[in-house]
């Protein structure tokens, strides 16, 4: 894969005027590059509705064919976006079965692909075995914390999670806590942010934690 623009540094926690400007600037760079230099036969947009729907307008005006994989969840919020999809997207590739009927009812060509995580899900975990494996108390309630998969998220929010969990534990001693360990982050990151807790840090078992 040829990486044209790196979006990894555009993540942000909370509201930031800078991120709005950065998104506008990146959108213009991508649109200009695709329409004036690269000129692809097909553009495949993936997720990221607020950003991709904006650049789809420019790309469509340039006569490009556009597919959208994991389109905006118009069934949950901002239903008006389906009009922009109908106008600028040639085909939607959806991951939920009911989305196919929804988009087709608005005259949008749609193909159901299935959810990419379904094939990866293991069999449901046995609760007693899971508790035993990780040294958890079967007589106490388990609270799972999913602090995010990016280092800056943990940097900004870990202290808040820890304080909130400890406050809850003081008020409700029957609670015990587990932290979901994102596979892309090192053990050292979690040791750094959760070293002063007795929380169990568990990697690769999100379904069981849920």
Model-derived features: where do they sit?
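Donor-nucleotide binding loops and adjacent catalytic segments primarily
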Residues: 1, 152-210
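Secondary-structure boundary/capping motif
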Residues: 60, 109-111, 139-142, 161, ...
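Charged active-site motifs of nucleotide-sugar-dependent glycosyltransferases
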Residues: 137-144, 176
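Active-site and donor-binding regions of nucleotide-sugar-utilizing enzymes
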Residues: 1-133, 146-154, 167, 171-172, ...
